[in-house]
C-alpha cells in the first residue's frame, strides 16, 4: 500500500498524469486530503468512481495514522497512541485551553501565554495541583465555570460578562466562532512527534529510553494533526489551533521530512506557520538550515543548562555542539515583527536550578530577543532526578525577570497520563495501569 497523504501537489500531478488524468484531478485529491481531511478514497467524491477504483486497485490509500488508543487527563489533555502503516507507534497530545476569563485581558500577550502558569507551587505540586490549576484556568467542555464566562446559553448565544467569548461574541451565536468556542475553549494545541523514539539521549527524558527506531515521513507527521483535528471536528479558519513539534524525536534530525510536513500543514491544511513552534535540542546544521527557510515555524531551543559542563551531563549532544555555537546560530535567524526565540529550561532539583545558574543564563541571553519557558521536571520511572522546590523555581524566575528576560513557568499538562514534557514513552503493552485509557482502534 502507498499513502497519498504526505504527497505534495506536484507529486499528485505526476501521479494523475501517469494514470492519464488531467492536472485538475490532482487538485481534487489535494483538496480532499488536506482541506477536507478525508479518511478514505471513497470520501473524495469529486473524483469519478472509476478513478477512485483504479487508485485503490493500484495500491493507493489515504494513509492517515490510526489512533489506536487514547488516555484522558483530569485537566482535559488527551494523549494518543498513533499507529503507522508498518505497525510502529508514536504519541501525539491534544491540549485544549480555556477562554482566558481568569488571566486573559484579550491582549495578544495573554493569548500567547495562556498555556503557562503563574506560580511555582502549581508547577511543582504534582497531579493534584496540576488538576486544580487546570480546572481554574480552563473552561470545562460544554459546561459553565460558575460565571457563565464565554459559554453558550443552549441556543448558541454567548452569555456571561467575564470571559473572552462573552466579550467577543456577546449577542451572537457562539457556534459561528468554531467548534472550540462552542465547547467553551479559546484555542487548542497539538503536540506532534517527528521520529519513532529519539537518538539525542537527554538524561531527564523518558523518550530517550526508547532509542531511535526510524524517522517519520512528512505524511506521518502531518497526518497526526489531521487525525486529531478530525477527532474533535475542528474547523480550520474558525478554530484557533497551535502546533508544537515537541513530541517524540528531534525534528532537526529528520529535517527534510519535518519541513515538508510544515509546508503541507501551511499550504494544504491552512494552518499558518506563525501558529507553529519547533523545539530542538541543539542540532547545529538544522538550525543553520532553518535560518534560511522562507516558510518556517517559531524556534524553541532546549537550553536546559547555563554552562557546557552541566549541559553535557544532562544532554550529551552538547559534546558535539556547545552552547556558544548554538547561540551564535540562533542569532542569525531573521526574526519577524513581534517574534522571539524561546529558550526552554527544564529545572532539575540541585542540578541547574540555583541562583548561580540563573545569573549564567542572563549572561548567555544578554541582548537577545529571547523568552524563557521554565519547565519543572516531570518525573518518570527509572530516571534519578528530582523536582526543584517551589522556592527555587520562584527565585530562578524572579532573577531572570529582574534581569530583563520575559520568563514563564509552563503549566504541566497531562502529567497524570504521562503526556507532559519528557514523558512520551509508553506503548500499548504498558498502558494497562493508566487511568482513563480508552481503546479506540486496533
Model segments located where?
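Conserved AdoMet/S-adenosylmethionine-binding subsite of the radical SAM
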Residues: 227-408
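Hydrophobic alpha-helical membrane-insertion segments
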Residues: 120, 136-141, 149
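Short beta-strand motif preference
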Residues: 80, 92, 188-192, 301
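Intrinsic-disorder-associated, low-complexity terminal segments enriched in Asp/Asn/His/Tyr and depleted
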Residues: 130, 138, 147, 173-176
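Conserved Radical SAM active-site core
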Residues: 99-122, 145, 153, 157-298, ...
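Auxiliary Fe-S-binding modules of radical SAM enzymes
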Residues: 1-127, 151, 155-167, 331-339, ...
